[in-house]
């Protein structure tokens, strides 16, 4: 069965633009693909382990080919369990609000924890290979200001560390088919409402054939 993993990146459950657009995407996707499974991963209700001394020691033991100690093995098992839903899914939907020109720290924590050699990528001395190859992703990017608007005082070329980071990371772990939908000006009343409506329509269109 085809499985979609929805990673919800906003803690604002009542008025989140990224969640609203993601929900529209998922509603349309369910209608178009009633036999597919959708799994939700709310990072704000997810126990993400600290990448602490034991985890770091396990990482370097693995890189050097040394056997793991019991504490290192336990730490590494938690990392592998956290990454398991990404291996089990065929498609990904990310809802990503922009925080301080980048992504929420909880999402960065998750990515930092699971982006490990032999977990999400391999390295043979000649180069890297992502272990999520063949999968596809749609990413909803929500922003309070108009980064793409002409004359913006936060132009995307200088201030957008959100979309480039997500796309670089996804491709690094093997996901080459990446679609982005941007909803901006969420702090601007009527203008923000118009942009939400446009993003929702775009999400529904993409979801039908995703």
Swiss-Prot record:
Reactions mediated catalytically: 2 a quinone + NADH + H(+) = 2 a 1,4-benzosemiquinone + NAD(+); N,N-dimethyl-1,4-phenylenediamine + anthranilate + 2 NAD(+) = 2-(4-dimethylaminophenyl)diazenylbenzoate + 2 NADH + 2 H(+)
Cofactor(s) needed by this chain: FMN
Enzyme class: oxidoreductase
One Pfam family from the record: Flavodoxin_2
Top-rank taxon: Bacteria
Keyword terms, alphabetized: Flavoprotein, FMN, NAD, Oxidoreductase
EC numbers on record: 1.6.5.-, 1.7.1.17
Annotated cofactor note: Binds 1 FMN per subunit.
InterPro entries associated with the record: Flavodoxin_fold, Flavoprotein-like_sf, FMN-dep_NADH:Q_OxRdtase_AzoR1, NADH:quinone_OxRdtase_FMN_depd
Gene3D superfamilies (UniProt xref): 3.40.50.360
GO MF annotations in UniProt: electron transfer activity; FMN binding; oxidoreductase activity, acting on NAD(P)H as acceptor; oxidoreductase activity, acting on NAD(P)H, quinone or similar compound as acceptor
Entry annotated with the keyword Flavoprotein: yes
Assembly and binders: Homodimer.
Chain's role: Quinone reductase that provides resistance to thiol-specific stress caused by electrophilic quinones. Also exhibits azoreductase activity. Catalyzes the reductive cleavage of the azo bond in aromatic azo compounds to the corresponding amines.
Family designation: Belongs to the azoreductase type 1 family.
UniProt name for this protein: FMN-dependent NADH:quinone oxidoreductase 9
Classification lineage: Bacteria, Pseudomonadati, Pseudomonadota, Betaproteobacteria, Burkholderiales
């Amino acid at each position: 069965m085809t499985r979609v993993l929805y990673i919800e990146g906003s803690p604002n459950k009542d008025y989140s633009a990224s969640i609203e657009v993601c929900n529209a995407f998922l509603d349309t996707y369910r209608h178009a693909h009633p036999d597919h499974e959708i799994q939700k991963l709310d990072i704000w209700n997810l126990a993400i382990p600290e990448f602490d001394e034991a985890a770091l020691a396990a990482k370097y033991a693995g890189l050097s080919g040394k056997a793991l100690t019991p504490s290192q093995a336990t730490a590494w098992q938690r990392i592998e369990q956290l990454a398991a839903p990404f291996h089990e899914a065929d498609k990904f939907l990310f809802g990503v609000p922009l925080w301080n020109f980048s992504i929420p720290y909880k999402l960065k924590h998750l990515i930092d924890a699971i982006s490990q050699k032999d977990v999400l990528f391999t390295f043979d001395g000649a180069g890297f290979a992502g272990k999520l190859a063949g999968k596809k992703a749609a990413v909803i990017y929500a922003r309070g200001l108009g980064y793409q608007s002409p004359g913006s005082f936060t132009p995307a070329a200088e201030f957008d560390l959100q979309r480039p980071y997500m796309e670089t990371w996804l491709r690094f772990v093997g996901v080459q088919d990446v679609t982005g939908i941007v909803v901006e000006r969420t702090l601007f009343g009527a203008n923000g409402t118009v942009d939400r409506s446009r993003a929702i329509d775009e999400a529904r269109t993409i979801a039908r054939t995703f």
